[in-house]
Amino acid sequence: MRAVQIAGGLEQILDLGVEYAQQRTQFGRPLGNFQVIQHQLVQLAGETSTARAAADLALRIVGGANEQFAIAAAKARASAAVAPAAAIAHQVHGAIGFTQEHRLQLSTRRLWAWRDEFGSEAYWNTQLGRMALDAGPNSFWPALAVSHVKQGE
């Protein structure tokens, strides 16, 4: 499932960004001590966690009543996270992140490829809209809330 791969790739670039911000010093202090870098890393963590949550939910309900809806939502959310997450990771790293020797560029190039495989976020958002319209007005909230997922699974 591409959404799971994307979520894992996002976690990797988040880890690389945090590690770099802790190690790199600028103006006599770690880059991670600057508030703007902290804010960027929090935004990256937010994109990562929402993609991971959507992918995890889709995995948990495979075979369930709303499987297709959850899979579409996971791919749409994970794909939508790629652009802002990659931009933030490269901003934190600066030019070093674009060099051939650095792992960041390998991860972000792979994320960009996965983003469009099996349909972009626009495609999956369209599918979600169609599923919601086809299900009717009384079915959308139960599908969205996935109340059928058992606690503790």
Go through each PLM region and give its residues:
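Alpha-helical interface subdomain recognition
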Residues: 1-153
